[in-house]
Amino acid sequence: DYISQLVPILDRTFARGGNVVIPSFAVGRTQELLYFIRQIKEERMLKNYNDFPVYVDSPLAVEATNVFCDSYSDFDDEAASLIENGINPIAFPNLYVSVTSEESKAINSDPAPKVIISASGMCEAGRIRHHLKHNLWRPECTILFVG
């Protein structure tokens, strides 16, 4: 169960004042993470940090998320039920997307604990390298590989 594993990681990292940086594939995995994070926030599983910001930092992931949102007919029963009740299964308060490189760079200037989901699941190129440069050396931060 992804959520039961994700909650303590978020809780420990935020308690230390750190960021959770998640290298993720832009299509599929990013949207799955947003689905789980929405549930964590909605059910208030992080009692002291429920309003944490989440940044999706990848133009391709942003586009894929938009396509995903337009494909409601392809959702499973659980997601379809959420939609029928007026809930977007991958949207929530404090979700931010960055498209430009300036927006991407600004993410690391915010000292508040946050989740950064950035494309390039293998960390070989792209914006994730910028986020690793700013967070990898910080012991309070967590780099979370989600496959």
Functional labels for PLM-detected ranges:
Residues 1-147:
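Acidic/His-rich, metal-assisted hydrolase cores and their charged scaffolds
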